[in-house]
């Protein structure tokens, strides 16, 4: 692609850089490599941690399933990190969820402009994303390399998170873009803020027939929520695209090589259930990248402005390392719990980085739950 020379010439640049001073650096690098090897051996003796992020569209039964799973373990070896409802409703702002739904309703009724709605939605999503992003940053220093999943002993600690940072920093902004209440520029601004993906990031997405999903959502009571079927369709579509995007990237897909295969229109808010890693690599048109071939992001020659291309590079870098699992929610709560438990046997653990990491992580998770877990 003519507008992205950095991709075309990266290998030549790297080759030239390596050729300068190579012999001088060889000796200097040897002690560093020995130190790194020692650090790896020490890390492999550390306890292991399993992190599971239960994510997907709202109203499927994620929280119920997670709480049932957590109840199977002891208080010391499995810890639940809930949605930060108190932060959303009290600490970070007042009634953020109600504000989001009211703003979308007013836009749909023609009471406010798309621009006015976008200002409110962007501010609200900052509030929604902050607890996830900062918690990820505090946790990161304690997460070491991946320990693998085959024949691994039980982890010293299992953390079950109610959502990953990408929910608030990617999926819900993208759905609001499909709903007309957020700009594509704002969505990519959130993408740029997604924290680097830690090793052993296991994300569980959900599958549930749409009619069953609507029925479950209609029966639950969450502060400030409205039954918005258009938004439900949009967020279901986005999570389907997310699963496809991870498969596309892990299968060797390159957005900048395949960009020309995209049409000039964003996908409609409808689509199939998320799929597991089985099957052929998805077409780029069935991934999140298709959302960003939008006129607002294109230069006069029809190519993406480089700043937006860089944001898509960030998106690819964040999603590629994720371990994605699909949970069938079309069963009883106990059945969902058992299916989730079975999925965990194939998930990837990590070593922690210090002898004190496990109690520190436990304290972090329980502090989060105590301070932000339930609205007062």
From Swiss-Prot:
Biotechnology remark: Used in molecular biology as a selectable marker to identify transfected eukaryotic cells. Used in cancer suicide gene therapy to selectively kill transformed cells.
Catalyzed reactions: thymidine + ATP = dTMP + ADP + H(+)
EC numbers on record: 2.7.1.21
Tree of life domain: Viruses
Biological processes per GO annotation: DNA biosynthetic process; TMP biosynthetic process
Active site: residue positions: 83
InterPro entries with a match to the protein in the record: Herpes_TK (IPR001889), P-loop_NTPase (IPR027417)
Keywords: ATP-binding, DNA synthesis, Early protein, Kinase, Nucleotide-binding, Transferase
Location of region: Disordered: 1-39
Keyword ATP-binding attributed: yes
SUPFAM superfamilies: P-loop containing nucleoside triphosphate hydrolases
Basic residues composition bias: residue spans: 19-32
Single annotated GO MF: thymidine kinase activity
Amino-acid positions noted as binding substrate in the UniProt annotation, renumbered to this chain: 101, 125, 222
Function text: Catalyzes the transfer of the gamma-phospho group of ATP to thymidine to generate dTMP in the salvage pathway of pyrimidine synthesis. The dTMP serves as a substrate for DNA polymerase during viral DNA replication. Allows the virus to be reactivated and to grow in non-proliferative cells lacking a high concentration of phosphorylated nucleic acid precursors.
Subunit structure comment from the entry: Homodimer.
Additional remark text: Phosphorylates and thereby activates certain drugs like acyclovir (ACV), valacyclovir, and famciclovir to a toxic form, that leads to successful suppression of the infection, while the uninfected cell does not have this ability because it lacks TK. Mutations in thymidine kinase may induce HSV resistance to antiviral therapies in immunocompromised patients. The most frequently observed resistant strains are unable to express TK and are avirulent in animal models of disease.
Family: Belongs to the herpesviridae thymidine kinase family.
HAMAP family to which the protein is assigned, alphabetical: HSV_KITH
Designated name of the protein: Thymidine kinase
Organism: Human herpesvirus 1 (strain CL101) (HHV-1)
Taxonomy of the source species: Viruses, Duplodnaviria, Heunggongvirae, Peploviricota, Herviviricetes
């Amino acid at each position: 692609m003519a507008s992205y020379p950095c991709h075309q010439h990266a290998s030549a640049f790297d080759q030239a850089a390596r050729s300068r001073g190579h012999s001088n650096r060889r000796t200097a690098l040897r002690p560093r490599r020995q130190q790194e090897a020692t650090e790896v051996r020490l890390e492999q003796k550390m306890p292991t941690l399993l992190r599971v992020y239960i994510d997907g569209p709202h109203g499927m039964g994620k929280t119920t399933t997670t709480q049932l799973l957590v109840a199977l373990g002891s208080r010391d070896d499995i810890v639940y990190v809930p949605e930060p409802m108190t932060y959303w409703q009290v600490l970070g702002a007042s009634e953020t969820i109600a504000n989001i739904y009211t703003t979308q309703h007013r836009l749909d009724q023609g009471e406010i402009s798309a621009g006015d709605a976008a200002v409110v939605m962007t501010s609200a999503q900052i509030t929604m994303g902050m607890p996830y992003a900062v918690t990820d940053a505090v946790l990161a220093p304690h997460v070491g390399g991946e320990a693998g999943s085959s024949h691994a002993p039980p982890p010293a600690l299992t953390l079950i998170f109610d959502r990953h940072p990408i929910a608030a920093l990617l999926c819900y902004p993208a759905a609001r873009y499909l709903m007309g209440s957020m700009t594509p520029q704002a969505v990519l601004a959130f993408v740029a803020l997604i924290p680097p993906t830690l090793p052993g990031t296991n994300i569980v997405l959900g599958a549930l027939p749409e009619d069953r999903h609507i029925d479950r959502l209609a029966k639950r009571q969450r502060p400030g929520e409205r039954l918005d079927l258009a938004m439900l369709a949009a967020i279901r579509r986005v999570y389907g695209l997310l699963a496809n995007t991870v498969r596309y990237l892990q299968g060797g897909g390159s957005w900048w090589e395949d960009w020309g295969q995209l049409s000039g229109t964003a996908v409609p808010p409808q689509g199939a259930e998320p799929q597991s890693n089985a099957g052929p690599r998805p077409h780029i048109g069935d991934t999140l990248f298709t959302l960003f071939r939008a006129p607002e992001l294109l230069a006069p020659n029809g190519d993406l402005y480089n700043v937006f291309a860089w944001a898509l590079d960030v998106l690819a870098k964040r999603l590629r390392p994720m371990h994605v699992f699909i949970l069938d929610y079309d069963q009883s709560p106990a059945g969902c719990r058992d299916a989730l438990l079975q999925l965990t046997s194939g998930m990837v653990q990590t070593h922690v980085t210090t002898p004190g990491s496990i109690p520190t992580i436990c304290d972090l998770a329980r502090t989060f739950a105590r301070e932000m877990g339930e609205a007062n």
